[in-house]
């Protein structure tokens, strides 16, 4: 899939090196993207402020400025996971207006469905796109290779992929990333 985290960062790094924030349509197509499919992963809705109206709370004494972070899998992972399908449970999340921050842990970093990001933003919810696991227990885990790539630095000491990473998140409209802290891979 062209949504491979490494390939996506390289694509956005190339755009940055050519003086642009985002790849061109031709660059996306050359990387294997169908432009119509790419739009399923893009959000086109700017975030709204979260609705806070104590008079509409079922329990009026609940702390008005509560912050709920919902961190659950979407749908069935990379197989469908929130993209259009005939499986109702893959497409449904109905608690956006109660959630301040949503994080899904079964998509790649840049692969959350744009419709989910749109729904989140319409309800004042920030949304993380997918997750990156840095774990040693999964056979074939490539976390060491990814860690080596993401910590690469430019000659001036800045991180090589930092701006490309931010531009990629901005292009897709997501508000951040989700990292699993369950292993020792964060030491560096």
Regions found by a protein language model. Name each.
Residues 1-86, 90-92, 96:
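N-terminal module-boundary/linker segments of secreted carbohydrate-active enzymes
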